[in-house]
Regions:
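C-terminal transmembrane helical hairpin of 12-TM major facilitator-type secondary transporters
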Residues: 240-282
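A late C-terminal transmembrane helix in Major Facilitator Superfamily
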Residues: 290-324, 332
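Helix-loop-helix hairpin linking two adjacent transmembrane segments in secondary transporters
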Residues: 92-138, 144-145
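Cytoplasmic helix-loop-helix junction between adjacent transmembrane helices
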Residues: 61-100
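Juxtamembrane intracellular "pre-TM" segments in multi-pass secondary transporters
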Residues: 143-180
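Conserved MFS/SLC helix-loop-helix module at the cytosolic interface between two early adjacent transmembrane helices
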Residues: 15-53
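Helix-breaking motifs and short loop linkers at transmembrane-helix boundaries and internal kinks
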Residues: 28, 49-55, 66, 257-261
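Paired small-residue
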Residues: 39, 43-46, 54-62, 265-270
Length: 360
């Protein structure tokens, strides 16, 4: 039930961003954000009270849809409010907060589950959704300029579908944006490869206790946070290039440590740096995409956000094939090589075509 629930919410997170992002480019950010939070709160409450598995699984999918709206709209709102270095800094801060959440959420969840059971976690999430919905309704101010809302509504034939097709065509026709999408896909492959294989690597291969595994996982998550903080201080073009090369080098070193059966203390520094370079890359890709397509920031953020979950869905099952350290090494190195190749091409293409747009 747990695995099916996680799978359903992941599909909801991927699909919801592609649904809500384009709508927000036409209708503004406030109303979609409010209704997404309402959907999240209602479906979370139903899931918490569910007594039948099929009801729980359906609610988890729609819960993901609602949460996805909040994810993509937070990025779109940032693109409405900030430009240049400020946008890069804000994206870095967001990624750093996510890294901190990655460390603290499992521990807090375990404490709540011990005290109130898994349903208690859902009721707390329901309360958070209600509070955020009220804040959105009564405090949040629309960030998408009225002129852009009116312009979007006056599309070629006055329909939303046509506007979405036009936005899709412009994104697909942009080779730089497509390169960023593939780079995000590969970086997410490393992230989810790490998440899905880490219990088997650290608890199985290195025989760590649950407590030490939790500390190790938290330390590596802090590596992502550190990389995100650094990413907020440099331009996205440089962060994408440095991050790709760094991930490849660290992936090779981690693989060598696994192949030669070195100790945890030999592997851990390179593993930490791999996560740090990953944290450097992820917010930079989002910043670059939103900078290039500010007029359709919702759609651009939706594509970049959704492709991350696609990467996770493609890579996570692969970690169950063969010996886990070898499989993880192959995933890390292959993704690293492709990241470097795309980064070199992307770097040249950006400088030739759009260097001024991405210079912070």
């Amino acid at each position: 039930m747990v695995q099916l629930g996680l799978s359903n919410i992941m599909w909801g997170l991927a699909a919801g961003q592609l649904l809500v992002g384009p709508i927000s480019d036409r209708r503004g950010r406030k109303k979609p954000l409010f209704w997404c939070l309402v959907l999240f709160a209602v479906t979370t409450a139903v899931a918490a009270a569910a007594t039948e598995i099929h009801v729980f699984l359906v609610m988890r999918f729609f819960e993901g849809l609602g949460a996805a709206g909040a994810i993509v709209l937070s990025r779109s709102i940032a693109a409405d409010r900030y430009t240049g270095r400020e946008l890069g800094s804000f994206m870095g801060v967001m990624r750093a907060i996510q890294g901190i959440a990655l460390v603290t959420a499992p521990m807090l969840g375990a404490l709540i589950a011990d005290a109130a059971g898994w349903r208690g976690i859902f009721w707390i999430l329901f309360g958070m959704g209600v509070v955020l919905a009220f804040i959105t309704l009564f405090v949040f101010v629309e960030t998408l300029p009225r002129s852009r809302i009116n312009s979007a509504q006056r599309s070629s034939n006055g329909t939303q579908r046509e506007s979405i097709r036009e936005s899709s065509a412009k994104l697909i026709a942009d080779p730089v944006f497509c390169g960023i999408v593939f780079q995000q896909l590969l970086a997410s492959g490393i992230l989810f490869g790490h998440i899905s294989s880490s219990p088997f690597i650290f608890r199985g291969h290195f025989d760590l206790s649950p407590e030490l595994y939790g500390l190790t996982f938290g330390l590596l998550a802090l590596g992502i946070t550190a990389g995100a903080v650094i990413s907020s201080r440099i331009d996205p073009l440089k962060a994408l290039g440095v991050g790709a090369v760094g991930m490849l080098v660290c992936a090779v070193l981690v693989a060598v440590c696994f192949i030669t059966n070195l100790s945890l203390w030999a592997v851990l520094p390179f593993y930490f740096l791999l996560m740090a370079f990953l944290g450097l890359t992820l917010p930079a890709a989002m910043t670059a995409a939103l900078t290039l397509h500010r007029q359709r920031a919702g759609f651009a953020a939706a594509v970049i956000g959704s492709v991350g979950f696609v990467g996770g869905g493609l890579v996570a099952p692969l970690t169950a094939i063969g010996e886990v350290t070898r499989t993880a090494s192959i995933i890390f190195v292959v993704c690293g090589v492709l990241l470097v190749l795309i980064s070199f091409w992307l770097n040249r293409r950006m400088k030739l075509i759009r260097g001024d747009e991405l210079k912070l």
